[in-house]
Regions:
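Acidic, glycine-rich two-metal-ion catalytic cores of nucleic acid-processing enzymes
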Residues: 26-47, 177-221
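Mixed-charge, glycine-rich, non-catalytic linkers/tails in nucleic-acid processing enzymes
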Residues: 89, 96-99, 105, 111, ...
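Generic low-polarity alpha-helical segments
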Residues: 22, 42-43, 112, 135, ...
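A glycine-rich phosphate-binding loop feature that marks nucleotide/adenosyl-phosphate handling sites
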Residues: 83, 156-161, 178, 182, ...
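Conserved RNase H-like, two-metal-ion catalytic cores of nucleic-acid enzymes
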Residues: 1-115
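A broad, low-specificity signal marking well-ordered, structured residues that form hydrophobic/aromatic
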Residues: 20, 40, 125-133, 183
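Alpha-helix initiation/capping motif
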Residues: 52, 59-62, 67, 76, ...
């Protein structure tokens, strides 16, 4: 999608049929709540599209948010609810479907292209690296991921745990330096108990004796 006309045509189409929605965040290291959408991929029954948002190949400075009534399939319900360019009341998590069928989380990294790996290594200390990786490479990655995830799609799986973990995550943790820190719950564990970590910190196992917990305080005082 590289013109306003093609964007408007796509937006009308999405109001009429179910589709897969996969998004690429600009920064590979930031939490979704501290991030932005670089581009997103749409797969309908017959067509594929990629829409640049903050990517340097974007055709507009103002890509609109869409709120639709049609079903949409996403790769991660929690991150989708944190930040997404398209919202719907009927959203299904493809990774959760894959896990329920195979008892294993889907490996999203296995289809990253050479361009992704090269830029991640070269610009490991830079922000928003995904904005400079060619859109065609993001599209190549998304195409393979969407095809594999669709194999295990089922509407019937209960997603309540994902909704609950999203509600916890979005509130964050207040710190002594007047900032918010966000964690990420992972329900895809061998024990079935969600882990809680992000950015190298295990929030579920903060040491009680070395002061690790003192930086987190109540925001309700």
């Amino acid at each position: 999608v590289n013109t306003q006309d093609s964007w408007e045509t796509l937006s009308k189409r999405l109001q009429k049929e179910p589709f897969v929605y996969l998004q690429m965040f600009s920064d590979v290291n930031k939490h979704p709540l501290d991030n932005r959408v670089s581009c997103y991929y749409i797969r309908t029954m017959t067509r594929e599209f990629i829409v640049p948002v903050h990517h340097n190949e974007k055709f507009s400075e103002d890509i609109q948010y869409l709120n639709i009534d049609t079903p949409m399939l996403v790769s991660d319900l929690k991150s989708h609810k944190h930040i997404s360019m398209i919202t719907s009341n009927e959203v299904y998590d493809l990774n959760w479907c894959h896990y329920m069928k195979t008892n294993q989380p889907y490996d999203f990294d296995k289809h990253l292209t050479t361009a992704h790996h090269h830029n991640y290594r070269l610009h490991y200390d830079k922000e928003n690296v995904n904005d400079i990786i060619p859109l065609v490479k993001h599209a190549e990655y998304f195409e393979k991921v969407s095809k594999e995830l669709m194999v295990n799609f089922e509407k019937e799986y209960d997603q309540t745990i994902l909704e609950v973990l999203y509600e916890i995550e979005k509130n964050g943790l207040y710190t002594t330096d007047d900032k918010m820190v966000y964690s990420e719950y992972n329900p895809y564990t061998l024990t079935g108990r969600p882990s809680n970590r992000f950015g190298g910190m295990n929030f579920a196992a903060l040491n009680k004796k070395d002061g690790s917990r003192k930086q987190f305080i109540s925001r309700h005082k």
